[in-house]
Each structure stands twice: as C-alpha cells, then as structure tokens.
A protein has these predicted regions:
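A short glycine-rich, Lys/Arg-flanked "PGG" loop and its adjoining helix->strand segment in the class I
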Residues: 177-189
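Class I SAM-dependent methyltransferase SAM/SAH-binding core
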Residues: 104-151
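Conserved class I S-adenosyl-L-methionine
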Residues: 9-12, 41-93, 106, 110, 194-217, ...
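Acceptor-substrate binding/catalytic loop of class I
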Residues: 217-235
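A conserved beta-strand element that flanks and buttresses the S-adenosyl-L-methionine
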Residues: 163
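N-terminal auxiliary segments of SAM/dcSAM-dependent transferases
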Residues: 2-56
Length: 314
C-alpha cells in the first residue's frame, strides 16, 4: 500500500464548515476550532470528536469485534457479483475516489486497480485495519479515515467518484438523507455515485404476506443491533432523485447461488453443492451480470438494488 498521507490535503474539519487541517506531529489540527484528530499507522480518526448516538456506538463496537467474520462473510459468490457490479458503474474516474463504508476493503481493493487514489472511510477501526492489510501491496495511495459518514471530513467538490456498497440500507430515513447530501457536497461536478440498497423483492414480499415482520425492515440477527430496510425500486429512486440524477437502477445478485448450494447439501448432495458454488464463483456469476439487463428478473428477484447516479450541475 502506497502511503495515503499525500491525500491529507483532501481532508477538512467536519465541525466548522470545512476548514483545511494542518499537520502537527501525530495529529491533524483544525486552526479554527483547535480540535485534534489523531493519526496512527496511516489511519486518521475523527470519531472521538463526532457526536455518535448510543446505538451508533453499539454498532461500531460490534463491527470492531466481528471484523474478521465480516471479512470472511463476503468471500466467494458475494464478492464475485457485488464488487464488479459496484465498481464498474463509476467508469474510469480521473481523480480520487471515496469508498464510503469501506469495511474490510473488498471494494477499496478493486477501486485501487483503476489506478486512482482512494479515500476509504468507515467508523470501525477494526475493519479499517483489515482494509489496510488487504491493500498494502496495491502501489496506489489509499487513505484510511475513521469517521461518521454523515459528517464527512472532506473538502467540498474533491471526489471524482463515490462508491457506497451495503451501507445505505442500514440507515433510517433521516440519516439516509444526510448521507446523500454529504456525498453531493464532496463530489466534483459530474462525479458518479455507485450505491446499493436492499431490494424488497418478490421473495420478501411473500415472506411479509406470511407474517414475517422482518421481511420489510428490522434488525439483523447477528449482533441484534443493525437496523435494515428493504426498498422498492420507486422508493429507492425517489430518495436518490431528491439529490442526484439517476442514470441506472437495477437488481443485482439475481441468482441465489449460495441458497441453491445449501439446498443440495440438505438433500444429501454436499459435493454437488460445493461444485455448483465453485462453478458460480469461477464462471457462472457472468449470468448474474446478464440478468441485470432483464428488468423482469432483476427488479423482482435481485437481492440488492445497484444505482448509478450523477451529481447535478450547479
């Protein structure tokens, strides 16, 4: 990993309107409000100076403690589909890219392959440290930033593109709006946002009809503290269009490869299940990409919505 310290010029104080920061030994300092933001092993932390709710602190604590499990959860078919779907929609940016809610760096790694520097932001130090290890050989600058996404410590108009994968659906309505406004603030004119959300698809609508209250919104079972909501296409589009011009909105992860493999294992065919999943990871996921262009399928069975939205001209 090439040091992200040259990217420090992109940062600004999130508390006083975006004052540029100055370096002072092991911290960045705001010359206006005099707040100090520690820098440790290439990671800049703004979290201690940000006002997080009790719920936010619980979620961050769980993310820290489950960072390794979280990293392993996205291996295989999930990454084979989600990473290319999220990254290819920003095209070939000609400037720094923001990976918002970077987690352990699965998207960050793919963004660095585009050859542009990346600012990787998350509120979990545990996942940020795993991200740093993942991309240490990238050869392209990446800056790890611990921060609340709703108050990004970035100067206005500095990001050529933004990715935000598996974050939006974890926020309630007011916070989703704050997130979009912050993205708009830090994006350069014409910059593209690639962002996913949970799809309230036919499967979950059927679950809802059968009395499953968690089909629409609720809290993830693991940890018990992660809110989520599944959205219809119209709902997601309306929220995005309040701030951005939406250029594409389609369902992704249209083939339930892991569920099919698990079904074969339950039928006493573990080898067949393993072979199916291996095939889908190596080659079969390309069919998932093709189905993104078939609205009748993608809109109704895709697990996620994947959006491409562009910053409006001022």
């Amino acid at each position: 990993m090439t040091s992200g310290l040259p990217l420090l010029d992109l940062l600004a104080c999130p508390h006083d309107g975006g004052t540029p920061l100055r370096q002072d030994a092991d911290a960045l300092v705001c010359p206006t409000c005099e707040l100090r933001f520690p820098v440790s092993d290439g990671l800049v932390s703004f979290l201690s100076a940000q006002q997080l709710s009790e719920q936010d602190h619980k979620e961050r604590s769980h993310r820290d403690s489950e960072a390794s499990w979280y990293d392993a959860m996205f291996e295989g078919y999930t990454n084979a589909v989600e990473v290319p779907a999220g990254v290819r929609r920003i095209g070939r940016p000609t400037g720094p890219v923001l990976d918002a809610g970077c987690g352990t760096g699965r998207i960050t790694e793919a963004l660095l392959a585009l050859g542009q520097p990346v600012v990787a932001v998350d509120y979990s130090e545990g996942t940020l440290r795993l991200m740093q290890r993942r991309v240490k050989e990238a050869g392209v600058p990446v800056l790890a930033v611990q921060s609340d996404l709703r108050a990004l410590p970035l100067r206005p108009g500095v990001m050529a593109a933004v990715t935000c994968i598996e974050v939006y659906a974890q926020l309630r309505a007011d916070d989703r709006r704050k997130l979009l406004v912050e993205f708009d603030r830090v994006m350069a004119p014409g910059a593209v946002l690639s962002m996913s959300a949970y799809n309230y698809n036919l499967v979950f609508k059927a679950w809802k009809l059968r009395g499953n209250e968690g089909a629409r919104e609720g809290f993830h079972m693991l940890g018990g503290d992660y809110y989520y909501i599944r959205m219809t296409k119209d709902e997601y589009r309306r929220e995005l269009e309040a701030v951005f011009d939406v250029e594409e909105l389609t369902g992704i992860r249209n083939i339930p490869a892991r569920s099919l493999a698990q079904g074969l294992r339950r039928l006493g065919l573990p080898t067949a299940g393993d072979r199916l999943l291996d095939y889908m990871v190596r080659t079969g996921h390309r069919a998932d990409f093709w189905l993104e262009n078939v609205p009748l399928v993608a809109d109704n069975v895709g697990f996620f919505w994947q959006a491409k939205a562009r910053k409006r001209d001022d």
